[in-house]
Amino acid sequence: MNNRQATTIWSAVLVEELIRQNASMFCISPGSRSTPLTAAVARNPRASWKMFPDERSAGFFALGHARATGRPAVLVCTSGTAVANYFPAVVEASADFVPMIVISADRPFDLQECGANQTIRQDGIFGRYARWHMQLPQPSTEIPLQSLLSTVEHAVAKSLGAPRGPVHLNQPFREPFDPEPLEGQDPWLEPLQAWKLDGRPRTSSAQPERRPDARAMATIRELLATARRPLLIAGSIPSPDDARAVASLADDLRIPLYADLSSGLRLTEGTLAWQQAFATPAFLGRFRPDLVVHFGGRLIARHPSAALKAWKPAHYVVIREHPERYAPDHPVSLSLESSLQTAAEGLMGCRSEPSAIKEPAEGFFLHCSGALDDLTEASIPLSEISAARQISQLITPGEALFTSNSMSVRELDSFAAALQPDGLPCGLNRGASGIDGIISTAAGYGEGLGRKVTLLIGDIAFLHDLNALSLLRSLSRPMRIVLLNNNGGGIFSFLPVASCNDIFEEHFATPQHFHAQHAAGMFGLRYAAPRTNREFEECFLAAGEAPQSTIIEIASSRSENVEQHRTLQARFNAFAETAFTDR
């Protein structure tokens, strides 16, 4: 057996075992050194794959796909800076516990650190952001293929273990790279005959059941039973089953539930928008929880953290599926590692008295909802707030949402209507909260879910991932992109630096003076630029029926958006004063 044949077989075995381990989505960027891997994927009929000219975009697509499926997508690239372009997506996957597998082709040992072209030190390139990394050997008949199968299984298990995250396999190849099949049999392959025939993974790993500690659960039940003003928080919760269990617990105990957009519960019919309450001083003066039970990850809005930091509740309990710490302001009195669903179900029935805050709160939320609906009246000008509100009203149950960071996610989290009978998947990159790779991540998220996705994104984030528009023509379902173009970084207008007139516009707002119409034409996408709420509704619904992806660009003003936020917040404050005075 020659080197080409050994490399061909090695790559085919590696790819086949990944597929058997249920890591069957491959995001490939073309390159010469990675030819054996690319050929192995292309020639495996059970592999799903997508080609990406840009590794950075590929990394974020894989991230979005894994967010949707809960399984790692596999990234394949050539040597050199190609693998470095995955770094932002790897950081996000690590920070937000998303499984991912990177396989980078590399030069062999004798070409390392000697001036060889397109060669960098790739082993361990992701440092602490990888859950595990392995420098694989150059394919050789001297190395048992069983060890390769075992390594693949371990890589998948490490990606899916607690805490989930990215894994890196660095694979050196020696020329020639083009595949050459083996004619006949070879002793090297004999130990794999049974594996080849049965179609199952050679080794399977069972993840441990994350059952909660009985003593900790007894403590939490007692705290919930005796608290006067308890509050449940649903932070980032990837699993719909977990999210539903937390919502059921809140209903059973009749206590308030703060549902973050990333929990999947924020848009569920009947969910109260506690984001509005926590941003309202008059409300906060009447509600000071003495117990917080926080399920899942971090929150989008800063107001809850600021309020809880000031209130210092007697007990702050965090329940998560992994051992990593979540305590940004260090308020936690009890941390429990457990399946969220199991923990929520185990806390059912521990309290009979409803929270005293519920009745006045419901009146407050009803008035807030009416004020927001006033902003969506058909004939008035479209705004960032009314666009976010209408998206939540118009999107259908079989679709999904994805949102960029900065102002986009805050508009949806704060002002969306809760109308979905069974909730709605809503993805966002909140691990490191960057604005890079958002279009790519949304595309992967929709493909992973098998749903049409609507993306809400700002103009700076849109420019950051502009080349990802080339992906949209090949998606299985067209995407809506709702672009909030306020000509700069809108969130800075809400920060103290906005008062520094001599430096603000050029150094923070950074206006780019562009419109997306020509970008849409360049990539063969539909384009619309509505000006009123009625026009937006028409464009949004038409995009849902169109065979191509659509960019709906909303030209807005940063200063007008700030003023609308302040006016709305003043109304919310008045509603809170009335709701509590009337009692």
Curated annotation (Swiss-Prot):
Listed A to Z, the keywords are:
Magnesium, Manganese, Menaquinone biosynthesis, Metal-binding, Thiamine pyrophosphate, Transferase
Give the UniProt record's GO annotations in the biological process aspect. menaquinone biosynthetic process
Listed EC numbers: 2.2.1.9
Cofactor(s) in the UniProt record = Mg(2+); Mn(2+); thiamine diphosphate
Q: Which domain of life is it from?
A: Bacteria
An annotated Gene Ontology molecular function: 2-succinyl-5-enolpyruvyl-6-hydroxy-3-cyclohexene-1-carboxylic-acid synthase activity
Q: Which reaction does it catalyse?
A: isochorismate + 2-oxoglutarate + H(+) = 5-enolpyruvoyl-6-hydroxy-2-succinyl-cyclohex-3-ene-1-carboxylate + CO2
EC class of the enzyme, as a word:
transferase
| One Pfam family of this chain | TPP_enzyme_M_2
Cofactor binding annotation: Binds 1 thiamine pyrophosphate per subunit.
Involved pathway(s): Quinol/quinone metabolism; 1,4-dihydroxy-2-naphthoate biosynthesis; 1,4-dihydroxy-2-naphthoate from chorismate: step 2/7; Quinol/quinone metabolism; menaquinone biosynthesis
Q: Which InterPro entries match?
A: DHS-like_NAD/FAD-binding_dom, MenaQ_synth_MenD, MenD_middle, THDP-binding, Thiamin_PyroP_enz_TPP-bd_dom
Q: Which Gene3D superfamilies match?
A: 3.40.50.970, TPP-binding domain
Is the Transferase keyword given for this protein? yes
* Assigned protein family: Belongs to the TPP enzyme family. MenD subfamily.
Quaternary structure, per UniProt, is: Homodimer.
Q: What does this protein do?
A: Catalyzes the thiamine diphosphate-dependent decarboxylation of 2-oxoglutarate and the subsequent addition of the resulting succinic semialdehyde-thiamine pyrophosphate anion to isochorismate to yield 2-succinyl-5-enolpyruvyl-6-hydroxy-3-cyclohexene-1-carboxylate (SEPHCHC).
HAMAP family in the record = MenD
Per its record, how is this protein called by name? 2-succinyl-5-enolpyruvyl-6-hydroxy-3-cyclohexene-1-carboxylate synthase
Q: Which organism is it from?
A: Chlorobium luteolum (strain DSM 273 / BCRC 81028 / 2530)
Gene encoding this polypeptide?
menD
